[in-house]
Amino acid sequence: MERTLSIIKPDAVAKNVIGKIIDRFETNGLRIAAMKKIQLSKNDAAKFYEVHKERPFFNDLVDYMTSGPVVVMVLEGENAVAKNRELMGATDPKEAKPGTIRADFAESIEANAVHGSDSLENAQKEIAFFFAQREIL
């Protein structure tokens, strides 16, 4: 059984579509093993997205991710990483297939509603960033 990290980003939290997004995960066979709503600090966001540190969009990404609360979740299920990425849709909502989370709820490539781990290895690191083992049930 795989686990992956999902973040409902500030734009989607502000639009009050948390429940609708969670429903997509649960309807498609992913179980929520852990979940919390948090406000990221600039330091937290910079550390989490450190891999993008040298990219031109890094500072805007950190600002955006700290602009409001986020919901972080551990999703569990068969092929959880791939299934979550399929449900999210393309990074740019204009390119996302109809019926995907980003096609339905994202505003732009910057405010694209959700984050999902891109590999099992990164999922483990990202889950550990937000959750203690005892919080994952």
Curated annotation (Swiss-Prot):
Gene Ontology MF annotations: ATP binding; metal ion binding; nucleoside diphosphate kinase activity
GO cellular component, one term: cytoplasm
Keywords: ATP-binding, Cytoplasm, Kinase, Magnesium, Metal-binding, Nucleotide metabolism, Nucleotide-binding, Phosphoprotein, Transferase
UniProt cross-references to InterPro entries, sorted A to Z: NDK-like_dom (IPR034907), NDK-like_dom_sf (IPR036850), Nucleoside_diP_kinase (IPR001564), Nucleoside_diP_kinase_AS (IPR023005)
One Pfam short name: NDK
Co-factor requirement: Mg(2+)
Keyword ATP-binding: yes
Catalysis performed (reactions): a 2'-deoxyribonucleoside 5'-diphosphate + ATP = a 2'-deoxyribonucleoside 5'-triphosphate + ADP; a ribonucleoside 5'-diphosphate + ATP = a ribonucleoside 5'-triphosphate + ADP
EC top class named in words: transferase
Superkingdom field: Bacteria
Example GO biological process: CTP biosynthetic process
EC number annotated for this UniProt entry: 2.7.4.6
Active site: 115 (pros-phosphohistidine intermediate)
Keyword check for Transferase: yes
Localization of this protein: Cytoplasm
SUPFAM superfamilies linked to this entry: Nucleoside diphosphate kinase, NDK (SSF54919)
UniProt binding sites for ATP: 9, 57, 85, 91, 102, 112
Assembly description: Homotetramer.
Reported function: Major role in the synthesis of nucleoside triphosphates other than ATP. The ATP gamma phosphate is transferred to the NDP beta phosphate via a ping-pong mechanism, using a phosphorylated active-site intermediate.
HAMAP family: NDP_kinase
Record-stated family: Belongs to the NDK family.
Stated name of the protein: Nucleoside diphosphate kinase
Top-level taxonomy: Bacteria, Pseudomonadati, Campylobacterota, Epsilonproteobacteria, Nautiliales
Protein encoded by which gene: ndk
